[in-house]
Amino acid sequence: KYFFNKLSEVEGPEGITAGGGYWSARISYLLGNAKEANYFLKKAATKERTFYGSLAMASLGYKYKPNFDLPKYDNNLINKILKHMGGVRALALIEVNEFYKAAREFRKIIPKFDLKDYPQLLSFTSKNNMPGLTFRLAAILRNDHNKILLGGLYPVPSWKIETSDLKDKALLYAIARQESGFNPRARSSSKAMGVLQIIPSTAAFIMKNRE
């Protein structure tokens, strides 16, 4: 219990401190100290965007309503994009649904934008089916500037998915976010490929085609 208590107090990743608080609460409850358990649950619940923070909030009966709204982008942003040849190419590629190639063009010109433009850029890339770039921009704002835009950190791609047998799109998006950051060209040293980082031999086994 001592180590979980200390873990809840350290300055570090929110997921770690929330886990320390949650397990301190569990142990305190089992030891019959409800007041202390409540204290640590409340402490963990302040990290509502983490797994253990969510568990703590549920244990306390709190309701969490995340805001996934992104700011609207305006014509000023479009004009800034058009000032760069890469931006012109990106807009042209969007017109013909070449979103991955458009995102590659955008990555080259992102450093030319001011930080204050990033929220609108997030909105633009999200609306135009560039989840990987949206996620990366949102991560920069979170990691370097402590600005949280949940709509950017958890983008919803406009993928054409056959939904007849798919029960949970959110799970598919979560795997894509974790495994590849929505990068369709991602490859690992173990030969895993694509947004879901599927290993060809595994795919062949599942499809019963090992030729």
Language-model features: locations:
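Catalytic glycan-binding domains that act on GlcNAc-containing polysaccharides
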Residues: 1-4, 13-16, 24-27, 31-43, ...
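Helix-turn-helix repeat elements of alpha-solenoid scaffolds
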Residues: 1-5, 60-66, 94-100, 148
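Structural signature of alpha-solenoid helical repeat scaffolds
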Residues: 12, 48, 77-78
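Long, contiguous interaction/recruitment modules in multidomain scaffold/adaptor proteins
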Residues: 49-53, 58-67
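TPR-adjacent "capping" and linker segments in tetratricopeptide-repeat scaffold/adaptor proteins
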Residues: 71-84
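Alpha-helical segment of the N-proximal tetratricopeptide repeat
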Residues: 85-101, 105-108
